[in-house]
UniProtKB/Swiss-Prot annotation:
This is Uncharacterized protein SAR2570. It comes from Staphylococcus aureus (strain MRSA252). Pfam families: DUF576 (PF04507). InterPro entries: Csa, Csa_sf. The chain crosses the membrane at residues 7-27. It is found in: Cell membrane. The keyword Membrane applies.
Amino acid sequence: MIQSKKLTLGICLVLLIILIVGYVIMTKTNGRNAQIKDTFNQTLKLYPTKNLDGFYDKEGFRDQEFKKGDKGTWIVNSEMVIEPKGKDMETRGMVLYINRNTRTTKGYYFISEMTDDSNGRPKDDEKRYPVKMEHNKIIPTKPLPNDKLKKEIENLKFFVQYGNFKDINDYKDGDISYNPNVPSYSAKYQLNNDDYNVQQLRKRYDIPTKQAPKLLLKGDGDLKGSSVGSKNIEFTFVENKEENIYFTDSVQYTPSEDTRYESN
């Protein structure tokens, strides 16, 4: 009888320990997930910034990487990647470096085509066209091969100018992950074609699929904030070995000396 009571007590004690450990792990995970969401929300608050000139007066997260007196540089990037079945992958996009010290903006529009060389190895053929921004208008700084490309560059709008995530907290069934070794973190949501941001992308790009995309928010670096980390937004419409269609966007605040770039 006594042994039976001891056995029962032992089992209860083990179950109690399991419940406590499980609760601690769940609480820690929920807390980290909330921190990841909050980290992304800090970036998503920038959407929309309709006039890119507004970044001259915006300050992002600063740490010891910034030198005294450096107001920092914003890097904005939007690109559309389309690889239909049986065809080469083509990427079109633009990168701007918005320098808050000089209140000047330079960058480039690029067209990249992924092909195979004579040995069947992947080869990335990229062309860059330098641009500058004045009074919120994109201006090519070198002659362009045709008027169509000129119009395409001048009319481009970055996703940060029209994207809107005011309903991000209403997105359901998000898959949140964290890798402490990098560290890196992400949040993934399945969207539908009625989503505002999806409609805006379809309005501006010829997206050759009716499939609704997944929204993937990706980040790396310290969750508390870091100028050496990055955060990216990706709308993945199709992703497989034969076909890839996705849109990526990023807005990053960095020390000005780290923003050298090349254009050709």
